[in-house]
A protein has these predicted regions:
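Pocket-lining segment of extracytoplasmic ligand-binding domains
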Residues: 98-101, 108-109, 133, 170-177, ...
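Bilobed "Venus flytrap"/periplasmic-binding protein-like clamshell domains
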Residues: 40-67, 72-73, 123-191, 285, ...
Length: 330
């Protein structure tokens, strides 16, 4: 099987291992206003605890505080559909979301103040089922109860349609169980409300579910079906995964559905702050990885991708100073 060759993604294979958002936005706004007089205070908007992005934000916040002298607050929200406009409006200084969510948000809402920092790491994902079931492939989901909807992460439905398309399925071929976000979907899976849930590898929630239900399995995706998947979502690709503590549920070498996770900011954040953020996370990668193993994939060169969202001037200066050219989509 020929999988997409990803030098930075291969690093993951080694080593161990929308209403609610208004409350989060208000809390973050209060924090930022109260700290306005304090220089270099940052708010990082992310998803709820247990998600991959919350762990990533926690790792970045710790490094920025300990290594760059920045006062940082991690602010959970209901989902990426909340995070992106929140950051664009300046109610958060930094946000983390997947590349598709960012593209759609900008196209729909004309978020002219949003600025890209870079692609922080790949986002490997899967449909998971109980290990005790006979389900092994995406095709086996036909007629099964599957999480769907994702009102706080609207573009997840697009990704799910792409994954289902790899086996000739559409959402109409499964029994849709509506959830607001992936964390709720995982909780419904544990409670027995669905047969399969969708999540990113490396998230604490995946480990929690695996331990709670006595083992989970990641469903295999046929490489031959990726042509159909790209008609739904062009940026998705299969990347290699092997059984290890990071890839929980992977029972043998296989390809897992992947795309990029982005770090972004807004036009009001000072250039030197963005420069300092990039410099700190690149230089202190080892510290990041102790908290978030997915950040093994982080490289300075990997940050600078081609994207429809303009880069923040601070990021542009960092890439220029370090002679890092832009690269195409993976």
């Amino acid at each position: 099987m020929q999988l997409a060759s990803r030098e930075w993604y291969a690093r993951l294979r080694i080593g161990p291992l929308r209403g609610a958002g208004l409350c989060g936005a208000a809390a973050l706004a209060v924090h930022l206003m109260s700290g306005a007089a304090q220089a270099q205070t940052l708010g990082i908007a992310t998803m709820t605890p247990g998600s991959l992005n919350h762990t990533t934000a926690s790792a970045i916040a710790r490094v920025l505080k300990e290594k760059a002298g920045l006062n940082v607050l991690v602010q959970p929200t209901a989902g990426e559909s909340v995070i992106i406009p929140l950051t664009s409006r300046g109610e958060a200084d930094i946000g983390i979301a997947n590349s598709l969510e960012v593209r759609v948000a900008v196209a729909e809402s004309k978020l002219s103040n949003l600025r890209l920092i870079g692609a922080i790491h790949p986002l490997p994902t899967a449909f998971f089922v109980r290990k005790s079931t006979p389900l092994r492939t995406i095709a086996d989901l036909k007629g099964k109860k599957v999480v769907y909807g994702f009102s706080a992460q609207r573009t997840i439905d697009i990704v799910m349609r792409a994954i289902l398309a790899t086996s000739g399925l559409t959402p109409a071929d499964v029994s849709q169980v509506l959830v607001p976000n992936v964390v709720r979907g995982a909780d419904d899976f544990v409670a027995g409300g669905v047969d399969a849930f969708y999540f990113a590898f490396g998230a604490p929630k995946v480990r929690e579910v695996d331990a709670t239900v006595g083992g989970i399995r990641a469903l295999a995706i046929p490489e031959a079906g990726m042509e159909a998947a790209r008609k739904v979502f062009a940026d998705g690709y299969l990347a290699p995964a092997v059984p290890n503590p990071f890839f929980i549920g992977v029972e043998k070498p296989m390809g897992v559905y992947t795309w990029d996770n982005l770090l972004f900011t807004n036009a009001t954040v000072k250039d030197d702050i963005v420069y300092k953020v990039i410099d700190a996370i690149v230089k202190n990668k080892a510290d990041l990885v102790t908290i978030q193993p997915a950040l093994r994939a982080l490289t300075a060169a990997g940050l600078h991708i081609s994207h429809s969202v303009p880069y923040h001037p601070g990021a542009v200066k960092y890439f220029s100073d370090n002679k890092i050219g832009i690269r195409g989509a993976r």
